[in-house]
Amino acid sequence: MKAKTLIDAYEAFCPLDLSMEGDVKGLQMGSLDKDIRKVMITLDIRESTVAEAIKNEVDLIITKHAPIFKPLKDLVSSPQRDILLDLVKHDISVYVSHTNIDIVPGGLNDWFCDLLEIKEATYLSETKEGFGIGRIGTVKEQALEELASKVKRVFDLDTVRLIRYDKENPLISKIAICGGSGGEFYQDAVQKGADVYITGDIYYHTAQEMLTEGLFAVDPGHHIEVLFTEKLKEKLQGWKEENGWDVSIISSKASTNPFSHL
């Protein structure tokens, strides 16, 4: 089948025009006219995922994080550039779905809500009329530490960071969540009455500002977005069966999380 057939189906579900302004999105390398027999879904494109794609004879990679985010001035061989050069050398096309999969109803932030049993979820921060990034909803009343433990468990994490002073452990019931690095949206969580905000990459001073505003937070890291790989694989497999596509779909097993904890 042609790559375009699969991508057209994906964009019917998750349109590119939902992406935030200035985002990198869509086909980034290769051609939509190429024949594809194997597709791999990954969160990131690093040397390990490229090696995995080459080993598995992948024709198309669908990634959340673009391998080219800033303009390139050259493609001279280097450890970073070789990631791209290897993709070109092995004729592997790359398609990027970044903030549009965060925003689309039934996408990544809704998958997070399903895992954490967040009910009555609506968007956190409006990006265009009727759509927004992040989600805010309710859970049964519980202690902050109980929620943090659940986040650790469902995302299979060694640790999470709690944003609180003096080991406070308040009861919470209204939760905001945004995958990736969502610190910039914390004011939306405050304005909409959230007790706690779950997001990654929270900066030191942002954490202090949150607490001053009465907002607690749980920082599970950026890498919880890896949920994208298995959930999108499930969706593509469903479309494959419905449409009789002759293509194999795999999710990356390579680790791209650069952090670990002692």
From Swiss-Prot:
SUPFAM superfamilies: NIF3 (NGG1p interacting factor 3)-like. Keywords: Metal-binding. A divalent metal cation 1 binds at residues 102, 225. InterPro entries: DUF34/NIF3, DUF34/NIF3_sf. GO terms for molecular function: metal ion binding. It comes from the Bacteria. Gene3D superfamilies: NIF3 (NGG1p interacting factor 3)-like. One of its GO terms (cellular component) is cytoplasm. A divalent metal cation 2 binds at residues 65, 222, 225. Belongs to the GTP cyclohydrolase I type 2/NIF3 family. Homohexamer. This is GTP cyclohydrolase 1 type 2 homolog.
